[in-house]
Amino acid sequence: MLDGPRLFRIIRSLLVSPAFRTLAVLGLGIIAVASAQPAWAGLEEAVKAMQAGDMAAAEKDLQVLVKERDPRAQFLLGTYVYGNPDSKMFDLNKAAPLLLDAAERGYIPAMIPLAGAYAEGKGVPKSMFESFKWLAIAERWNSPNSAGLLEQVGRELKPDELEKAKAAAIAFTFKTK
């Protein structure tokens, strides 16, 4: 029979064992993945709809996730549904705020199209400063293709503006809410 102190020692030895910690982390990971399944399913359905050319269905699937501020959904909706000139739902005034919110919260893929929107003044006020800032942030986080674009936009800024934009990029912190 197990008495209190002996049972306590057995439980304590289990809790500190590497195997238990591994199983606990694995269990938490499974719970996290299982709870994310509805979001993943919504993204998967939206991508299938976009591949089929059904932007209305893609928008419907993504809007549910956008309301939850899922940056992946914001990026897909902003880039491929509203930001795509070939889409019947093309509207840069809807695309830019989605990309901005995703980028401000750290979604790196949204930063390059957002920088392009600022450079061209489409959906947001034209600002080479903001364009450079977002490209510099993207480059700092190793976004592919950002270096060439950064150099190109940098040539459009005066030296003092360039330094201010670099400083703004370095000082930028991602929003958490």
Task: Give the role of each language-model region.
Residues 145-177:
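Terminal, low-structured helical/coil segments at or just beyond the last alpha-helical repeat
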